[in-house]
Amino acid sequence: EFDLVFIDADKVNYPTYQLIAFNMLKKGGIGVLDNMLWSGKVIDPCDKESIALRETAEIIRNDVRLSPLLLPLRDGVMIYQKMK
C-alpha cells in the first residue's frame, strides 16, 4: 500500500488507472491526477480524452470513500484522500 499515487499518463485510460490507484492506496492516502481540465478541452463532448477525464472525475466525485478537490491550476489537478 502507498501513501501517495500520482497519475499523469494517457488520458483515455485514466478511469482504469484511477481504479488501480485506489486499490494501491492505504486509508488516508492521497491520489493526485494531473491534466484533469485538459487545457479547457475537458468540455469537448466528442474528444476521447475529454470523455475519459470527465468519467474519471465523476467516478471520484461519486465515491463516498474519497474526499476530492479539483484545483483549476493550468491543466487542472485533482487531489483526493482515501477516507475508507
Task: Name every feature range the model reports, one short phrase each.
Residues 13-84:
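C-terminal substrate-binding/active-site "lid" region of AdoMet-derived donor-dependent transferases
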Residues 6-11:
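Switch II (G3) loop of P-loop NTPases
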